[in-house]
Amino acid sequence: MEQTYQYAWIIPFLPLPVPMLIGLGLLLFPTATKSLRRMWAFQSVLLLSIVMIFSMNLSIQQINSSSVYQYVWSWIINNDFSLEFGYLIDPLTSIMLILITTVGIMVLIYSDNYMSHDHGYLRFFAYMSFFSTSMLGLVTSSNLIQIYIFWELVGICSYLLIGFWFTRPVAAKACQKAFVTNRVGDFGLLLGILGFYWITGSFEFRDLFQIFNNLISNNEVNFVFVTLCAVLLFAGAVAKSAQFPLHVWLPDAMEGPTPISALIHAATMVAAGIFLVARLLPLFIVIPHIMNFISLIGIITVFLGATLALAQKDIKRGLAYSTMSQLGYMMLALGMGSYRSALFHLITHAYSKALLFLGSGSVIHSMETLVGYCPKKSQNMVLMGGLTKHVPITKTSFLLGTLSLCGIPPLACFWSKDEILNDSWLYSPIFAIIAWSTAGLTAFYMCRIYLLTFEGHLNVHFQNYSGKKNTPFYSISLWGKDGSKISNKNFRLVTLLKMKKNGRASFFSNKVYKIDDNVRNMIQPFLSIPHFGNTKTYSYPSESDNTMLFPILILILFTLFVGFLGIPFNQDGVNLDILSKWLTPSINLLHKNSNNSIDWYEFFKDAVFSVSIASFGIFIAFFLYKPVYSSFQNLDLINSFVKMGPKRIFSDKIKNGIYDWSYNRGYIDAFYGTFLTVGMRKLAEFAHFFDRRIIDGIPNGVCLISFFVAEVIKSVGGGRISSYLFFYFSYVSIFLLIYYFLNVFQNIS
């Protein structure tokens, strides 16, 4: 066992040869390197698989022995200061290693086919392998200096991948936005690291925690300064994990390739912030109010992310806000002191979200055969629908990921989210109400995404919904070039599902329309589609290749079974809670005297309540977004609510207000754009004006005045001595007269 730990230092460096060899190959042998480009995908998967096997071995030893291993190399600069570099293997490290490698391998296999026709194929795999190296180095770091170095490398890789298609202005701006937003958090992290080094004199985690606890117990620290340093450390995690108010970069990060979205949202960049808080939790729990601040940021992010996901049209943006909300749950759990629940949800969410993103990538890949390569069209759920019979495997996988995120048993996220929700009651009833309500919102918007994508009919084949033109509402070329705009610029997504033939908005209609041979006749008691008299033959999406489906099927298995790792049952000598063994010893401020086990009755009582809330959210989603030829088409209960009146008008205003809030991202981006971006530009313009007109203007003005005075004097002189003597005596006389009159006035006064 000791020998296995001794060689753990090699873990971050195993994927590193791939980007190095790709770079050298493109520099020295560009033609051969490009012709053998598929070989690099195999090498990337192979090296990361070796890391995964090594990590599994370490994890098994962690579960059996609960040991912690640290190895440090010291570089002594002088007698007073030395730099120490090493690696730390503990339960948190082993969990993150398994997570990074398993998700990373699935994404790499998926990317081989997804990126096969992209000219940046080699660049993509170089970035991906370096991304894995950076994240593996981050989680094995033994001190804050190493954390910061690999933290920045993770950020660099994410910026490169977000702006992978840098020739697209939108992608370039998204990259810049991610960079600038994370600069704020990273600067705070650096200041926090320096602050705690100034307090304790150490960067090593063990020494830092021990020295700081001694200082706290002896009351030898300034609590205001300590709290400020802790908040600065936490700011780094806030930016990296897209917590409010530094969350604005995450939805725009969807401009990168879909496999990158899966990796960033599941196991790398956004997980880094959660990892940092979990690693520093022994430091945070002894600082007054910082834990409350962490939980406050978490609960705000939980609710904000869910509300912003309600009306997104882009499938990847909807999933991005879902990630933001789920990361808020993890941050809430850490702030409550429920360390096990936070890491449990990090694991289950990673596999479920990777499944959803790879499933969405499969959908986008299939839609590109219809709309061409144009993310605004291939990712737009307005143009989707009816994909169930065309991509059945993708549909099934996406449904399982959706149900998992909704919290439906026995899927993965049910077990972890239920644990966080139950712990929230012990922490704060207000936080618990918000967290439970958001669980219902999660079920609603995830079911909405599923219904709009897979159920109903393929909207891309229908004509202009406004009834004014006989052209498709998207004029789509094969290569996704700009076509005609949507006829109604401000139309809402639900409007497409509730327009009557005459163009008037209505929720309810009993008319029967025959659409075409591919869509059967339908009666629409609720959300109705306008009548399209189109009988043309269209092409349809097809299922993705096996190379893309294989990782999706593996992630289905993880989504089905990974939740059983943390089942908190321990009865009759049978302990099923593998996760608790893995995390021994762990921190839990809410269950200090508990062995992390509950009885069957308490479990079922809590589970029924959480599943009921999720089911209610799913029902509301079906109520609003159900397919137009669903089995509920004759449900007259819905039509009983049709009557228009003041209440209906008021409810529509509320609904439209919620839609505007969600679709406009809570106006937070607009606020930043107005008050920060524009404000900084105005300040820069004022500084430029002050520098040019005031700072430079004063000496320039003196020089200019001196120049003109000199010119005047020069014009007076003609080169004659008599003229010089005349002016000299004149000036002296004037001076003497002034002096005389001043003395006279002084004597008189």
Curated annotation (Swiss-Prot):
Keyword Plastid: yes
EC number(s) per entry: 7.1.1.-
InterPro entries for the chain: NADH_UbQ_OxRdtase_chlpt_su5_C, NADHpl_OxRdtase_5_subgr, ND/Mrp_TM, NU5C-like, Proton_antipo_N
Major localization listed first in the record, in broad terms: plastid
Name this protein carries in UniProt: NAD(P)H-quinone oxidoreductase subunit 5, chloroplastic
Compartments reported by the entry: Plastid, Chloroplast thylakoid membrane
Membrane topology classification: Multi-pass membrane protein
Pfam families reported in the protein's UniProt record: Proton_antipo_C, Proton_antipo_M, Proton_antipo_N
Gene: ndhF
Gene Ontology MF term list: NADH dehydrogenase (ubiquinone) activity; quinone binding
Keyword Membrane on entry: yes
Gene Ontology terms: cellular component: chloroplast thylakoid membrane
Function: NDH shuttles electrons from NAD(P)H:plastoquinone, via FMN and iron-sulfur (Fe-S) centers, to quinones in the photosynthetic chain and possibly in a chloroplast respiratory chain. The immediate electron acceptor for the enzyme in this species is believed to be plastoquinone. Couples the redox reaction to proton translocation, and thus conserves the redox energy in a proton gradient.
UniProt record similarity statement: Belongs to the complex I subunit 5 family.
Subunit structure: NDH is composed of at least 16 different subunits, 5 of which are encoded in the nucleus.
GO biological process, one term: electron transport coupled proton transport
Residues annotated as transmembrane: 9-29, 40-60, 89-109, 125-145, 147-167, 185-205, 219-239, 258-278, 290-312, 327-347, 354-374, 396-416, 425-445, 549-569, 608-628, 694-714, 725-745
Keywords on record: Chloroplast, Membrane, NAD, NADP, Plastid, Plastoquinone, Quinone, Thylakoid, Translocase, Transmembrane, Transmembrane helix, Transport
Reaction catalyzed: a plastoquinone + NADH + (n+1) H(+)(in) = a plastoquinol + NAD(+) + n H(+)(out); a plastoquinone + NADPH + (n+1) H(+)(in) = a plastoquinol + NADP(+) + n H(+)(out)
